[in-house]
């Protein structure tokens, strides 16, 4: 029942979820207690492991026992056995535990004091919780169910997956929206809720609970990645704001009270999603993480995995690469776009690792080694002190003037000491080998701008974008292969085989069965993997489009080549490959869905932008601005800049906060309760193809055909079913063969059906009898004689 089994069902479901989550954190702590991961990262990795177990273990047994309670009990037993084995094999001595920070109470206080992002996470998490609470089939006083703006569409589809998997228990599952077709959509983001629904949780609780844990994993995974990469809490904080409170420059189109009022009154007329003004870069919280469960659960794995993999590359331990490979291999049926993005990120990072592994080494020791090496290499040339010290025996402006150390010198020295991996601390970043990363962005922007001009005249890029993308990727792979051969010629193959090699093998072992069983069969249609140029730009010049959509991060990205270290630019380089691929090809019928790739690239863009902002402040603000307006004034100015960059996002979040729409009428909800009580989970019910049809969403029953807004973008051939639905409503007496063809047991009739079809009610009486009726809604049972 979508109402749940009361307190008992809720407690059982919450307990089941908590057991997997808690045991996963225990496993993560045990496996990583001797590694150089903070306790926060250990628990984060453990929580991801627990959720992966909850998503995958029941499915392993479901192949034999279907998606039943038996499969879930066995899954829990498997998790318990795994905990026992890990606890038995992994012993953490007291000394190994003591080496980690943030172990005592006062150390935990320091954790919160040194990482103020916790405050922003708490506020944003509260917003997320409120939106889920007010948007997830909220019961109104009259018995109807309501939702919000962003969840008005996709939530119905996710409900149908959750309820049908749990109620029908068939595995592998089929589309309840198109019976007879294997469910190839990445359904693990929904099966995790199906497990809780099976335990007795209400549909609302089963839907919301896993999302609460997932959003925290997304928040923490992003922050840990940026901090590992850039090494500073302040930079990670700014990057976090730029990504999760993104807004762009769309607010400039809402320059009077009337237009601002429309933001909160119209359907999708916000500063981040306004088609008439070509505003397409949506607000992450509102339009990506709240309504799109696959994206949420995909990022909940991807972001912590990237942070974990970053440290694994630096540590070069086989165990860490095996763990990363297992998590990566589990991604395809959670979120295929995240898996594809991960592949591109790993390809770029592998290339960097083959060139210089020290790029991924973080910490003061590594910074000291780099600074010392740079100092030795640049201190003397031809017996003379270079520009980093003196020129021709005379102190430079950054060293001494008239034999005295200037305040600028001291300030620069302090900045360099505290930011050892930045450009200002080492002249090594200015070498010729680093120049490519400083020009890559501008070359890419020029390339796509020229492509856009050519495309406007003859649609060259729209026709041949896929071929251009394949050629570009092939050249990248060839260069990667060349670097790989050079690496193997100069170093031991074992060093690579037991890190990246074993990572690739583990990924393929876990991912290939998913790809062949589900993904490839559905992605083989003509509308998958095809040429498409410039994502969702509808008329703007290429650079202008991204300038107004991304706003401050794009401006800072343009400046980054002048202020950000080559090391940080290189590690953030995966966004270049992701952007190149996503701008030339589409990977499903909905072109817009390439933003699921672009937003992963934006993770690195926000990191680079945050680093650029910090560098600009430390190079120029600390010297010039502080003397004019004081340090507090500079900090306030920076805060105002970030606030302005987030105004569009705040307005969009405000719109989502107040949005309220009726999703299912009171009589429709009552009809669904009747259907759940009086029909079997495998009965097929004839309904309209409306996206918010309550029957598949609330009851999990199969219908003849669901909404084209779902089925078309999944690459399914639904058109004949859609035509037959109309025929069965408009000419039921002459459509008896269709009732037999689709094995229709019941007919659902409401204002949705009356408004969509010219319903022949008299004809319906010839094939079915009314068994339930309330207001405009009636349920009909097809006569047995139809099937004789």
Regions found by a protein language model. Give the residues of each.
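Signature aromatic-anchored transmembrane alpha helix within multi-pass, membrane-resident enzymes
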Residues: 354, 383, 413, 420, ...
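Membrane-embedded, hydrophobic transmembrane alpha-helices
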Residues: 1-111, 367, 373-376, 409, ...
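Extracytoplasmic
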Residues: 617, 621-788
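Start-transfer (signal-anchor) and selected internal transmembrane alpha helices
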Residues: 69-141, 233, 477-492, 788
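Hydrophobic, aromatic-rich transmembrane alpha-helices
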Residues: 304-312, 346-347, 475-489, 549-569, ...
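Membrane-interface alpha helices of multi-pass inner-membrane proteins
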Residues: 286-289, 321-335, 347, 448-450
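Transmembrane alpha-helical segments
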Residues: 128-132, 245, 249, 334, ...
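Active-site lumenal/periplasmic loops and adjacent helix-entry segments of GT-C-fold
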Residues: 124-301, 336-340, 661-662, 689
